[in-house]
Design a protein with these regions (language model features):
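Conserved acidic/glycine
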Residues: 46, 82, 86, 104-106, ...
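Short coil/turn segments at beta-strand junctions that form active-site/ligand-binding loops
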Residues: 70-73, 101, 169-172
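Cofactor-binding active-site loop characterized by glycine-rich and histidine/acidic residues
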Residues: 1-98
C-alpha cells in the first residue's frame, strides 16, 4: 500500500485514493489504466498497445520449451488498435518463425479506438491508423487464420474455437471476430471508449434491463445525495445483486 510508481512520483499519472468504508475495509488500491499483475488473475501487463502480445508470445515460447506441442495453450486477447504497434509485428513474426502452435490469438475487430471509427483499412476504404486489415497482417506473418464472423453469435464463436483446436500444422492460430464496440449499451464506436452512462441514470438502467429480465433480478435504484460513501455503497449493493 506504500508502493508508488515512477510516473506517479514524476506527476505524469494521477493515482487516486479515497477514504470510503469499503475502500478501507478491503485495503483497495486504485486500478491502473491497463490491467497489470497488481490485479488478481492478470499474469502479465496488458498495455499500452501491444505490450500484452509480446509477453504472451514469451509465455507461449516458454510453455513450448518446457511442455512441448501437447502442453498448455496460451490464449491472447487483442483488438485491431493494439496491433498497430511495431512490437506486435515483431511478436507475430517471432511466434510464426518459432512454430508456436500453442499460441491462439482472439482478435476483437470492431474498428473503433479512442478517436477513430476506422482504425484499419477495410475493402476499398483506407484506415485512419494503418493501411492493412488485421486478417492480412496475420496471414502475411504465416499465422493460421479463422474468420468467426459475427462475434456476438456464440455458435459462430464456439465453432471457430473448435476449429482452432483441431489445427495441427505447427503454426500459431488467430481467430477474428467482427464486433461492435459498445454493443447494446447505448453508446457505440469511439464514443464508448472509456465512457459510460451517468451514475444510476435512466440510460444506465435501460442498458441493464436485458440482464434484469434474463436473470430475474432487480438492481438497486439510487436516490438522494451522491456522497462518496453512498455512491460506494450503491456500487456494492449492485455487485451483490448481480
Amino acid at each position: 500500500r506504500r508502493r508508488l510508481r515512477l510516473e506517479a512520483l514524476l506527476g505524469f499519472r494521477r493515482t487516486p485514493t479515497q477514504s470510503t468504508p469499503f475502500f478501507r475495509r478491503f485495503k483497495c488500491a486504485a486500478l491502473d489504466g491497463h490491467p497489470t499483475p497488481m490485479t488478481p488473475f492478470v499474469p502479465v501487463a496488458t498495455g499500452a498497445s501491444g505490450v500484452g502480445d509480446t509477453s504472451a508470445v514469451g509465455l507461449a515460447l516458454a510453455a513450448m520449451d518446457v511442455f512441448g506441442p501437447q502442453g498448455p495453450r496460451i490464449h491472447i486477447l487483442e483488438g485491431e488498435g493494439g496491433m498497430t504497434a511495431g512490437r506486435v509485428h515483431e511478436a507475430l513474426a517471432t511466434a510464426a518463425t518459432a512454430g508456436l502452435s500453442n499460441a491462439i490469438m482472439h482478435l476483437d475487430w470492431n474498428q473503433a479506438s479512442i478517436d477513430s471509427d476506422r482504425v484499419t483499412a477495410e475493402g476499398d476504404k483506407p484506415g485512419d491508423y494503418v493501411q492493412w486489415d488485421p486478417r492480412e497482417l496475420l496471414y502475411m506473418n504465416d499465422w493460421n487464420l479463422i474468420e468467426a464472423g459475427d462475434g456476438s453469435d456464440f455458435k459462430r464463436v464456439l465453432a471457430a474455437q473448435k476449429a482452432a483446436l483441431s489445427l495441427d500444422n505447427g503454426q500459431p492460430t488467430a481467430i477474428v471476430y467482427r464486433t461492435t464496440k459498445g454493443w447494446k449499451y447505448g453508446i457505440e464506436g469511439r464514443g464508448s471508449h472509456g465512457a459510460g452512462h451517468a451514475f444510476c441514470s435512466e440510460a444506465f438502467y435501460t442498458a441493464v434491463e436485458p440482464f434484469e429480465a434474463a436473470f430475474g433480478v432487480k438492481l438497486p435504484r439510487f436516490e438522494g445525495e451522491k456522497t462518496p460513501d453512498r455512491v460506494e455503497a450503491a456500487y456494492w449493493e449492485t455487485l451483490l445483486a448481480m
